[in-house]
Amino acid sequence: ELIHYIISSTEEKVGCLFLEESVKQSGLGLLSVQASKRFHITSEDDRDWTIDDKIKALDELRNLEQVVFWNHFGSSTLDNLLTRVRYMVKGLDCQYIILDHISMVIYETTNERKAIDDIMVKLRTLVQELGIHLIVVSHLSRPQGTGHEEGANISLNQLRGSHSLAQLPDMILALERNTQAVNEEERNRTCVRVLKNRFSGESGPAALLQWTKQSGRLTEIPFNLNDDDTNEDEEDE
């Protein structure tokens, strides 16, 4: 959704370093968003698309040259990653870089905290040098009590691995969803929470996104304040 939004609303190029999926999977996902069809569902009994739908989506996505995928599956060394990012920016003119996810970057130490500290410092330095937008995906530590898969609120100290994950970024967004809810509509609803905003200081719940099974798309929906579990400070904002 994010990649599709960027290339549909701007002329900027996006460099994608998705370390947990293949280029084929990434491209198929982008086509699915364009067509509002779940092209990854291949069972004849479950799928609601045809080959013609896929061809049409590819024809419609004329701005596909704005997307650059790194053809790599699995972990990568830090030096290799930094070189790829620099090439995407300097050689291919990408202004947006998406790294998913930071824990897949291999570092020559068994100390995860030290490794992520160094990775984040070097990525931040690269952002300042190149003047780019860098989006980094991070996993979370397990909270005590209710788990994140049951919709527990996310805090900065749950970013897994290092305090630098919270200190160095300009903006930190958390995606919260109760994947175990009995109600299907609630189960497919995601809250976007701003944990850090260096630009204006505004924080708290920012948007609700509803996933639709038929289209596989996310759509922003209004907040229901009666169901909001935010604290008083967040409600005042």
Residue ranges: model-predicted function:
Residues 1-9:
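P-loop NTPase Walker A phosphate-binding motif
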Residues 8-93, 107, 206-208:
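Cytosolic-facing regulatory segments adjacent to core modules
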Residues 18, 98, 137, 168:
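Generic enzyme active-site microenvironment
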Residues 19-21, 132, 136-139:
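Conserved H-loop
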Residues 22-26, 50-54, 77-81, 98, ...:
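Helical mechanochemical/support elements of P-loop NTPase systems and associated helical scaffolds
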Residues 42, 76-97, 128-130, 143-237:
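C-terminal regions of RecA-like/P-loop NTPase motor modules
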Residues 60-69, 126-134, 165-170:
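A structural motif corresponding to the C-terminal end of an alpha-helix
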Residues 94-134:
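Helical hairpin unit composed of two closely spaced alpha helices linked by a short loop
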